């Protein structure tokens, strides 16, 4: 190819692009269309494809059931009679007029408060002790965490045998001359027993979370505090608690939500008794829907439970601005 032909080709390419030379990475010449499948669009499509299974699962198992629950709450559904009648807001009016609801909410509140306090306090105490790197700490960590992976129903049944009037706990008390109470038949002891069973079931999870947070606290801060003459207790409240406050927030939200969803322990140990002293909201919902066959009212109670959980979660999340410490 001659030099004359090369110059002519270059001139033709300039005229085709309006007299401007296209440079790699530079602005696109006027009149040239941007390709649709750019690298950015391909990355976006890849991301959407990856989250599609999760979105489908959420739609089928979360969003659709919520819509159906709202729909059922507007109807009176009697499975035995085969009727499904629209009643509008009557179930919500029945919720407002339910004389049993205050006692149910009281029992739910007592259980939630007791569980959150004992669970978080014991989990933090165990985490602090295990963080001392004492001999055998790995064994104790495994022992405390093992109930988390045990079947909930099996765990509760075993505790039911231990808490009987002639069970293992009262047998131990008899050996030291103490007459143990009937744990599951007294109003106060029944609620306390259910709380203790749930605390020992899940304390290991919060303990592991606290332990991970404690191991992330820089040792230099404690060394500097010791040089300044700060006591161990002052170091704990001024250094440890602020730096693990995000984990405290996380564990408190998890524990509060879990406390409002308790069912198996009540169903196995007390069946809501004695009386209604341990009838929490989820168990009351179960009674209305599956024992008394008031499915519409049961759906209304589930909406009330959802509203309570959502309100408490939002409240905890908003309160984080006052006491949760972020290094950034």
Predicted regions and their residues:
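Transmembrane alpha-helical segments of polytopic membrane transport and secretion proteins
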Residues: 1-51, 134-137, 316-328
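A structural signal for multi-pass alpha-helical bundles of membrane permease subunits
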Residues: 43-328
